[in-house]
Regions:
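Flexible loop/turn segments at secondary-structure boundaries
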Residues: 28-30, 141-143, 184-185, 261, ...
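A charged, amphipathic alpha-helical module
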Residues: 220-334, 344
């Protein structure tokens, strides 16, 4: 019989083939991206912090000689803790009495096994009649419990735990999701009670409460039996085809393997396709799947199908340059032009005052200034990189920014939503810089516009209008504009976000090299915008 952990169960729930591949063809699995790795690291930190929600926490974790969880020992330890709890006071954990001498027992990593199914409950909280499951996630939700649609993806995980515990004879009296409060703003020391939101998964929603666990709980034994039977056969690969489960609730790392039969490019490379995208010119994922199921998978298969303007250019491999529209865009610019780009980092648990979970914290910016039309600036612009001392970088960055960009300036960015948001956030916490920062924000012009609107399109862009796609399409033979050629360790925003917080713990020589790498990367971001602007000027 194949053992099923809660992670394996939820993988099966999303896609049986994904679980089978994870067990028998793990070498086909893509490496998780930087954001996924950071989310996993954040989950560990958030999980430990959640222990502080309760004063009477005992940890059932036991590790072997290699530092790995000793599941058998953890199960035995959990049983002993629960047996000893029979003498503990029976206080309702939802009565806000945690600081009293009668606080309920809380077992962290409480481990259980039944018929080949294993789970370790993040926090198992004693109640007057049994035990409540508390599953800790590093996601953030509003104080009002979020919405059922946002929370449903956590239900299979919790339902599996409830089923295993119930089969082990535990009376599960409640199931809860413990997550970060999206509304929490740090002021001084962390307020653990305000940092977290505890959501009753059997009573979700304000206007029309829903039990998100009941239906999933009934499916658990059926799914367990099917998953265990499937995993007994290492030779027969499941036949699940491409569908929504390839991206929801989590992107599948076996996509390249499962889509290897598709031509390149394929229908799934056509511009658009987010589950939540809206707009007449978006090529919805549902539409892509409809074409795929009908056998229309290559660009040639799509030529005679109804398409939006951008999709049509992409599928027909058109080069489209609308000189008039580009000129109209350029005429909106006011000189001198200040080309600006921020680098940011984010923390699941706010590190600084006046910040929220996962808020983007600007620690660096780059600036190139073009004084007049038909002129060009030096390749090396002005760069600001905050001190690597662990302090909040935003104040000094905002001061430096205001010193270099005057009020009323025309500031050019690429995808203005990001820079506008950072400027607004800093303006809100620094009253003396408020007007200046908002003036910079109000003067922003978005260089993305002529590409996003389809005024300038080349087949090499592949339907993507990010600067990382536009730049090599416009300058295919310029090694100085190739991010891969940057020296050092920083070649993209994810690496910048990861490396900066680590610099303070690096040896001096390594720290200096990392800072130089950050400066060169960010400088290329704004120099790239200057080159793109110059290309548009010569249309």
């Amino acid at each position: 019989m194949t053992n099923l952990s809660k992670s394996k169960y939820t993988t099966y729930w999303q896609c049986p083939k994904m679980l089978w591949l994870d067990v028998y063809k793990r070498g086909e699995k893509a490496e998780p991206d930087m954001s996924t790795k950071m989310r996993l690291e954040a989950g560990t930190k958030v999980g430990k912090l959640a222990h502080q929600l309760f004063p009477n926490v005992v940890d059932a974790t036991v590790t072997d000689a290699n530092g790995n969880p000793d599941t058998s020992a953890m199960i035995a330890r959990t049983q002993q803790m629960m047996a000893n709890s029979s003498n503990s006071p029976k206080i309702n954990p939802r009565s806000n009495s945690f600081n009293s001498p009668n606080s309920p027992l809380v077992i962290a990593e409480a481990a259980f096994s039944y018929n080949g199914c294993y789970c370790a409950v993040d926090l198992l909280v004693q109640t007057p009649d049994g035990w409540d499951i508390h599953e800790v996630k590093s996601s953030s939700f509003p104080e009002q419990d979020g919405s059922p649609s946002e929370l449903k993806k956590y239900a299979p995980d919790i339902a599996f735990q409830k089923w295993v515990l119930t089969q082990c004879g535990v009376n599960v009296t409640g199931t809860h999701l413990v997550c970060l409060s999206a509304e929490y703003v740090r002021h001084g020391d962390l307020d653990i009670q305000q940092l977290f939101v505890i959501i009753d998964m059997q009573n979700v929603g304000v206007k029309k409460p829903m039990d998100l666990i009941a239906d999933e709980y009934l499916k658990v034994p059926i799914n367990v039996a099917k998953a265990q039977k499937m995993l007994t056969d290492s030779q027969t690969e499941p036949t699940e085809d491409l569908d929504r489960h390839c991206e929801k609730p989590y992107p599948c790392l076996f996509w390249d393997y499962c889509s290897r039969h598709l031509p390149s490019p394929s229908v799934f490379d056509v511009y658009g396709g987010s589950f939540t995208s809206k707009g007449d010119d978006r090529f919805y994922l549902d539409k892509k799947l409809e074409h795929y199921r009908a056998g229309r998978v290559s660009y040639d298969d799509l030529v005679d199908q109804p398409l939006g303007i951008i999709q049509r250019m992409q599928v027909e491999r058109q080069t489209h340059i609308d000189a008039g529209a580009i000129r109209s865009f350029l005429n909106t610019l006011r000189y001198p032009l200040y080309f600006l780009d921020f680098e940011t980092m984010q923390f699941a648990v706010p590190e600084y005052d006046d910040s929220k979970p996962y808020q983007q914290i600007a620690f660096q910016y780059s600036l190139h200034v073009v004084e007049a039309p038909n002129t060009i600036c030096d390749k090396k612009g002005h760069g600001y990189l905050a001190p690597s001392d662990g302090s909040d970088p935003r104040r000094k960055l905002a001061e430096d920014l205001c010193a270099y960009i005057p009020m009323g300036a025309c500031t050019v960015v690429y995808n203005d939503t990001f820079e506008k948001s950072r400027l607004k956030e800093m303006a809100e916490i620094y009253p003396d810089l408020h007007d200046h920062l908002l003036s910079i924000r109000d003067g922003i012009c978005d260089l993305l516009v002529p590409f996003r609107e389809g005024h300038y399109y080349l087949p090499a862009m592949g339907g993507s209008f990010s600067i990382k796609s536009v730049l090599p399409a416009l300058f295919p033979s310029d090694p100085d504009l190739d991010y891969h050629n940057l020296p050092g360790t920083v070649h993209n925003g994810g690496e910048a976000m990861t490396i900066f917080p680590l610099i303070q713990s690096m040896p001096p020589a390594e720290a200096d090299a990392a800072r130089q790498s950050l400066l060169e990367y960010c400088n290329l971001d704004t120099w790239a915008m200057v080159k793109v602007w110059d290309k548009l000027m010569h249309v």
